[in-house]
């Protein structure tokens, strides 16, 4: 399944928001591949791989939260209206967008998980696939949020 995920997501070359911003980049996949390859010995317990993926997810989730906070503060400090007050409409849209993205991310990773033999996060292999999806989705959203500041 991991090969399916990497090949599927690795083949996506869509660009969004900016000419040089790729939806899924090599870093997204390389961090996941590193977790699998560093721990791919036959003797390695899948829980070691899962732990590596969990650490990577925690890292990218922290980066996402930082990017969201920076985008929020940017909108507060540089309102699109030119008026020297926070743009509450745009701040509310950012909040709604983030909530909608969280729902999308969860559904997207459920879809990936549906390809597994055991579609339950209590299964370590399924959880590893789910974490891989979460890492890719989170990195993608982080780049999107960073673009809001740079546009």
Enumerate the predicted regions with their spans.
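Positively charged n-region of N-terminal signal peptides that target proteins for export
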Residues: 1-4
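N-terminal signal peptide c-region/cleavage motif recognized by signal peptidases
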Residues: 11-15
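N-terminal alpha-helical modules
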Residues: 19-151
